[in-house]
């Protein structure tokens, strides 16, 4: 709920209108504290009437801090959070992530606490002891709590959001990413089992996400046009997998394949991918019709990274390595965002859309990097 900032000057109390059109009334009590009406009002006259009642109570010496607060509804945080989670229009994986955050980090402290009783001090105490060893989980937990309380504010269940810790939603990176070198990528690729060598090549040189690669099908590869089309992704939900859309709208994209990769991808399609447009490029080890489980790939990748002397390298770091390689060609940030399928509101405001056709130039320059390495 965003305020317009318009305040009405009055002899007693204050009235302000929200962007929603509703009105809020508040006043300073005889004890010097500011009191806010327990709910907002459809009409300004109703807000004025509430203030008139409070002024009359003060004049008649009938006032108390509880005056006018009797009709404020109460709601335990746990009950409200469950409803909040059910009503959110979010992807299954995000919902599962929020569920885990609530169960593991938030509900143990706040489940039975009334929303009105969650104070900034209570939030600070909770934050000080929550997921201290896992900064990302800690930041996500705080962000979720803040989002739920912000909705409670919009629902007029609380007067203000108690989540006010500056920077708490941002995690300081513990794992410092060191991109793989071309030599390391070559070693890792060769150390992988044959059916999954192309996975490493495409994860790095095309900078693709794990879920995009494991849902990639024969129909998505255009060798003649030298393009990989990303239209779907797969996510782990419980014990199974679910095909969904890419992580963001920008994730739906055509990625130009560096020309030097075409022979390897063509060979992979010929030797390791079943016939048919719907055949997965990188299926399960035991079933060509099932998606590849992360744990199965990790077992192979961990051995390969050890051979390259890079025990610190994660599968997702291959994507980061690819971004660094693409950046080294002189690609602009906007072009990199297009190639990576990454977009944020802030970036959209700061940078123009990537120039059409430049992605193929970037891909060609990537191949030149590889050719120079071989010389």
Curated annotation (Swiss-Prot):
CDD domains: INT_ICEBs1_C_like
Catalytic residues in the record: 209, 316, 319, 342, 351 (o-(3'-phospho-dna)-tyrosine intermediate)
InterPro entries cross-referenced by the UniProt entry: CB, DNA_brk_join_enz, Integrase-like_cat_sf, Integrase_catalytic, Integrase_recombinase_N, Integrase_SAM-like_N, Tyrosine_recombinase_XerCD
Gene source species: Mycobacterium tuberculosis (strain ATCC 25618 / H37Rv)
Pfam families linked to this entry: Phage_int_SAM_3, Phage_integrase
Residue stretches making up the Core-binding (CB) domain: 75-153
GO BP field: chromosome segregation; DNA recombination; establishment of integrated proviral latency; symbiont entry into host cell; viral genome integration into host DNA
Name of the protein in question: Putative prophage phiRv2 integrase
Family recorded in the similarity comment: Belongs to the 'phage' integrase family.
One MF term in the entry's GO annotations: DNA binding
Chain ranges of the Tyr recombinase domain: 175-364
Induction (UniProt): A possible member of the dormancy regulon. Induced in response to reduced oxygen tension (hypoxia). It is hoped that this regulon will give insight into the latent, or dormant phase of infection.
Keywords from the UniProt entry: DNA integration, DNA recombination, DNA-binding, Viral genome integration, Virus entry into host cell
Annotated SUPFAM superfamilies: DNA breaking-rejoining enzymes
Gene3D superfamilies attached to this UniProt entry: 1.10.150.130, Intergrase catalytic core
Function field: Integrase is necessary for integration of the phage into the host genome by site-specific recombination. In conjunction with excisionase, integrase is also necessary for excision of the prophage from the host genome.
